[in-house]
Regions:
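Short acidic-glycine-tyrosine-enriched beta hairpin
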Residues: 74-89
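Conserved short histidine dyad/triad with adjacent acidic residue
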Residues: 21-26, 38-54
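Short, conserved beta-strand element in jelly-roll/cupin
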Residues: 39-43, 53-70, 108-110
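A generic "binding-loop/recognition-motif" signal
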Residues: 56, 75, 91-92, 101, ...
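Short beta-strand His + acidic residue motifs that chelate non-heme Fe in jelly-roll/DSBH
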Residues: 50, 70-71, 87, 93-99
Length: 128
């Protein structure tokens, strides 16, 4: 069996609203069939917008660096380095970097997904 590996710096970076994204595990990157993963970087004060959901699967995020808050189905919780959060299938969610440094997050998806499995929810935001 061939080892299927990719270094973060070798993955194409996509500039998306509120974040920079690199797919690390996907059908294209390493021929994954049942899961996918990406790393995102979120600048201080930025929100991953628009709020969205994944109608065909779950997402787990793991905060590698930085701090902020998540919105999941109307519930807001703080997140810091070392925090993992489940975004259940179909639940509207978003991420906000409230810290003073760049936030770095690994996002895991099951089953495998891509940007085509994002259902956008314009107008949903954090309550302030």
């Amino acid at each position: 069996m061939t080892v299927r590996a990719i270094h973060e710096e070798d993955a194409q970076e996509l500039g998306l609203p509120g974040r920079h994204l690199r797919w690390l595990v996907s059908k294209d990157a390493v021929h994954a069939n049942n899961c996918s993963a990406c790393v995102i970087r979120v600048a201080p004060g930025e929100k991953v917008t628009p709020a969205h959901s994944h109608p065909n699967g779950e997402e787990v995020i793991y905060i590698i660096k930085g701090s902020g808050r998540v919105l999941v189905a109307g519930d807001v919780r703080p997140v810091t380095e070392g925090t993992a959060v489940l975004f259940p299938q179909g639940e509207v969610h978003m991420l906000h970097n409230t810290g003073s440094e760049e936030m770095k997050v690994v996002c895991f998806f099951a089953p495998a997904t891509g940007l085509d499995n994002y259902q956008m929810h314009e107008g949903v935001d954090f309550p302030d």
